[in-house]
A protein has these predicted regions:
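A short acidic, often aromatic-flanked loop/helix-cap motif at beta-alpha or helix-coil junctions
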Residues: 9-12, 94-98, 148-154
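Phosphate/ribose-recognition catalytic cores of enzymes acting on nucleotide-derived substrates
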Residues: 189-305
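N-terminal catalytic cores of NTP/NDP-binding nucleotidyl/phosphoryl-transfer enzymes
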Residues: 7-71
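N-terminal Rossmann-like or analogous alpha/beta NTP/dinucleotide-binding catalytic cores
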Residues: 57-138
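Glycine-rich, Lys/Arg-enriched anion-binding loops that position phosphate/diphosphate groups
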Residues: 140-230
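Short acidic-hydrophobic, aromatic-tinged amphipathic segments that line or gate anion-handling sites
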Residues: 1-10, 88
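Residue-level signal for inorganic ion chemistry
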Residues: 27, 79, 116, 172, ...
Length: 305
């Protein structure tokens, strides 16, 4: 997959079929779009191109919170697995946001894009003025990819974030499909309270502004040096900032400074307030028992990355 940049390159290739979007999370809806892109490229003997953005368009247009489901690096790696011919990244700016739908279509045509795969409800161009009719009235071939519905809801990045915030990890993972929701962070020193009750945790400094699950304790897998370990992870607030801590089962190595991944599998319990360390230890002991039961009843496929 060849990476390009809209500001300094133009495609000189055989005809191209493309789709575009931010593709946050690469969820089931995105996966369906990608698969249809590949199918229609084979039928038409076109090369494939994914057109995406270096940041969420909403963060530029409306200054909304820029929380994401997937880090930039992981998004690129996931898209690369599909073996598309090109990945063309747009550096999204206020100037790009003012492009009309007609200007965007003209840019596609100028770069040898002959066909596109889109959702029937697509909106694009300045203030979302372009829609499916705009595309169909152009000289582009237009292929439609319908919404994917899971649990009676259209799969979207926004819906998945709502599920995570509501602590519905199993439904969020169903929408993501490819792998459970995963975050990455660097292990840093914390206040070491859990160590005093013999449950040392890895305190994460997150590498990306992730859309975190709601404040609670979760059953997770944690990856260290390319190996996955069963774990429990708590998301809490400290000094009004989200804090993520993971306890790895059967693990006693030094993690400080390491980059680790945490994969969320299921909700364990809501967070509780404890008046003393003895009560905290009793609860964590119970959590450990429930976590061990969970993994004993789960398929070994969970450990596959």
């Amino acid at each position: 997959m060849k990476n390009l940049n809209i500001q300094n390159q133009k495609l000189k290739s055989k005809p191209i079929i493309a789709c575009w979007g931010f593709f946050d999370g690469i969820h089931q809806g995105h996966q369906a779009l990608f698969k249809q892109l590949l199918v229609n490229s084979t039928i038409n003997n076109y090369q494939t191109c994914i057109i995406s953005f270096d940041r969420k368009p909403q963060s530029v247009i409306s200054n909304k919170n820029n929380e994401v489901l997937l880090s930039y690096e992981d998004k690129i790696k996931t898209i690369a697995k599909y073996n598309f011919d090109y990945y063309w990244e747009i550096k999204f700016s206020k100037e790009i946001a003012t492009l009309s739908s007609e200007q965007f279509i003209s840019w596609l045509l100028a770069n040898n894009v002959k066909a596109v795969v889109v959702n029937p409800n697509i909106r694009f161009g300045y203030q979302g003025q372009g829609n499916i009719k705009t595309l169909q009235q152009s000289s582009l071939q237009v292929y439609l990819c319908n919404d994917i519905v899971v649990i009676n809801n259209k799969v979207s990045s926004t819906y998945i974030k709502q599920l995570l915030q509501n602590k519905d990890i199993s439904s969020a993972n169903l929408c993501l499909q490819q792998e459970p929701y995963t975050i990455s962070g660097k292990v840093v020193h914390g206040i070491k309270e859990a160590r005093t009750i013999n449950f040392p945790t890895a305190n994460l400094s997150l590498l990306t502004n992730y859309a975190l699950p709601g404040l609670a304790t979760y059953i997770t897998l944690t990856e260290v040096d390319n190996k996955w370990y069963q774990s429990m992870t708590v998301i809490m607030l400290r000094n009004n900032k989200p804090l993520v801590e993971s306890y790895l089962l059967n693990f006693n190595q030094d993690l400080y400074g390491k980059i680790i991944k945490v994969r969320f599998l299921d909700f364990l319990r809501d967070n509780l307030k404890f008046t003393n360390l003895d009560d905290l230890k009793k609860q964590v002991d119970k959590d450990l028992v429930e976590t061990i039961k969970y993994f004993a009843n789960s398929s070994s496929k969970l450990l596959k990355s």
